[in-house]
Amino acid sequence: MKQEIDFIKFNPTQNMTVLVKTNHPAETYPHIAAQIMSYDNVYAEQVGFIAGAIKPEAAAHLEMAGGEFCGNACMALAAYIASENELKSTDFTEIILEVSGTDQLIRCQVKQQHNQYFCQVTMPLPEQIEQRTVKYEGIDMDIVIVRYREFIHIIIEVEAFDETMRKRAQALARLLGLTLGDKLIGILLYNAQSEELAPLIFVPQLDSLIWERGCGSGTASVGAYLAWSRQKEIVQHIKQPGGAIKVMAEWNGAELERITIEGSVGIVAQGKAFIDA
């Protein structure tokens, strides 16, 4: 028997994102997401579910299929709400969201630009940033751990995105998925010279391991790391396979004060998906 799913598909920096409009029990989210993400269905890198917000100041609640936090999905939902409200103003409109993976309300500034929506999102601040040298697969590896409440990013500076490093990153992501209780593990390969990022995102609950074409939260973590290591404000366009995402990390002299990412979102499809119930 087939089940109908109402969905919208978005393109935030080619990090193809599907948001589900119909209501479903939370325990069915991984099952629905796995089918929607597959090549023979709607096909996407991630799936989120739109629900009513609990807090009165929030316009909606976004629950990612694996309970993770996702910056690009926040942009996508803000763009959708703006489109539903027929936002035509050239000025920014603020949309506040409740989002899985963080207890902070997420503030999104949105304005329409041609056939897309330009979004600025204030991101959750990391709880801890630390630099370590770990022995992995027989070599000493310098890593930066950027820890949030329910997810963790590991930044590894590289000179090239070669196949050996990619395979090592994939094995490390799965290992951390087994040993840590986080809802999301990101391995972020970063080339400081070219300001390029190759983001690998693992969501253990979905067993989803994807080299994303653009990663908003990964971009925020790179900005946080650069501000922390240089002890100063950072404004940088982080190049990724799907395009660049701008990050602004404010440093107050002692700690990170605020992180914002900017990017464009296109609404590329809307309709019904049919999945096995």
Predicted segments, located by residue:
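A glycine-rich beta-to-alpha transition motif near the start of alpha/beta enzyme domains, typified by
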Residues: 1-117, 147, 152-277
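Membrane helix-loop-helix hairpins that form the core translocation module of multi-pass transporters
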Residues: 116-125
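Active-site glycine-rich loop that binds ribose-phosphate moieties when present
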Residues: 125-144, 163-172
